[in-house]
């Protein structure tokens, strides 16, 4: 585990190749995404490192249902009693009332690699968990300093990013884009609709934020929205 302080009381928690984020500025702590399965102890240790107990984790915001982002959800809810917030298109999948959707890789290479994707826990088994609050595009949540929901479909149908208004705007991107060797679209083999995903990146480029935090890749701190706008221009070429 790597614990990174992004701003005072805002932390990134990296487990292998995926990031989640603890927002501890308010009395009720909020977690954005829950990371890879069977790693709930990692988050409990992270809470301990920042001098908090599991019971102080009150809210978990889920950007989407993939198990590298939702894998610890059920275990963390059991450990903390936290409420879960997710988009209505993700909620039935998280609850386990509908099956996990499958991507449709187009190229021969992706079709050959597809069985490996499940083994990497992108589409592996997801333990059912409650979703207490279904959120809508543009909704301002009464948690995490007033997080604003941005529906960013493409990677999954109900994928969301969330924007914190503090610190000049902090955008929690989820997998709407990645920041590995520069800004990039989400991974093609695990994205339901890449054209829609690129439209969502354009939507994010219209927002005002200074910092961007990604599910995969490093934090962009300082004029992150300008970097997104340059990325949007690159996608349009």
What residue spans do the PLM features occupy?
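Conserved beta-strand hairpin/beta-sheet module of binuclear metal-dependent hydrolase folds
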Residues: 1-50, 161-174
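Short, structured coil segments at secondary-structure junctions
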Residues: 6, 79-80, 208
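Residue-level marker for buried hydrophobic side chains located in beta-strands
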Residues: 30-32, 61, 84, 170-172, ...
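Metallo-beta-lactamase
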Residues: 37-38, 123-132, 140-226
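Active-site HxH/HxHxD metal-binding segment of metal-dependent hydrolases
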Residues: 48-132
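Short, hinge-like loop/turn segments at secondary-structure boundaries
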Residues: 100-106, 191, 230-232
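Short, electropositive alpha-helical surface patch
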Residues: 223-237
